[in-house]
């Protein structure tokens, strides 16, 4: 029973980690995208 339970917990942990990793990279990308246009606008001015 323990052997059957552990793989399920590992799968759940993998799903949680994948979701957290997927969410974390998106926010920095949004921040970078917001910063880049501001820098370009400043250079044009």
Swiss-Prot record:
Localization (cell):
Nucleus; Chromosome
- Write out the ranges of the annotated region (Disordered): 1-45
Task: Please provide, alphabetically and separated by semicolons, the GO molecular function terms listed in this UniProt record.
Answer: DNA binding
* Superkingdom: Eukaryota
Keyword tags: Chromosome, Developmental protein, Differentiation, DNA-binding, Nucleosome core, Nucleus, Spermatogenesis
Biological process annotations from GO? cell differentiation; spermatogenesis
Give GO cellular component annotations, separated by semicolons.
nucleosome; nucleus
Q: What does this protein do?
A: Involved in nuclear basic protein transition: histones are replaced by spermatid specific proteins which are themselves replaced by protamines in late spermatids.
Q: What else is known?
A: The sequence of component I is shown.
Protein name, entry field: Sperm-specific protein Phi-3
Q: Which organism is it from?
A: Mytilus californianus
